[in-house]
């Protein structure tokens, strides 16, 4: 069997698994394995075993994520990174427009390229905030330039540094990578499109999955790859 045939069989299986997840909404991977594979009377596990025997490659379903509602997606590099991003739209009819579709894809590409850890400041766990503040306090204590500064000034500096942390790690606060379309942060970009469409749009969550997550893998610069893709 040639590589092309193996790839086509694998992609057909992946598509079938995705359709099965959409149709049955399994609670987890173990539940998914026992569901009937899309369009057949065989389970996902049985179908996977057939595929393994057919193409001679050992495989297993490790994870999946599902989002409901208004969702935009982006797949990078033939499946190396996949993104889903959810929106609340006051006038849901606007979600069917070309402008919304482009905005959703651009935000999903942002997530693929910049890998934000959180949606917004409120999404950052309290323990993470405290950990970052502890690190900042230790750094400032070791900095001779900070020794003579009043507490109020130190507090302001610390707040500024935390703001930088949020800007780097929270999607809505990140600088929008498509500066050719909008200069500002992601929430500003979304707000600008919402204004153009005459409705309210709010980001409500995202999922970013990278091929090989949890496995040993080589480092890749997705921000650079996506920038090249944007610039042609």
Task: Identify the residue ranges that each predicted region occupies.
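N-terminal assembly/interaction segments in proteins that build large macromolecular machines
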Residues: 4-232
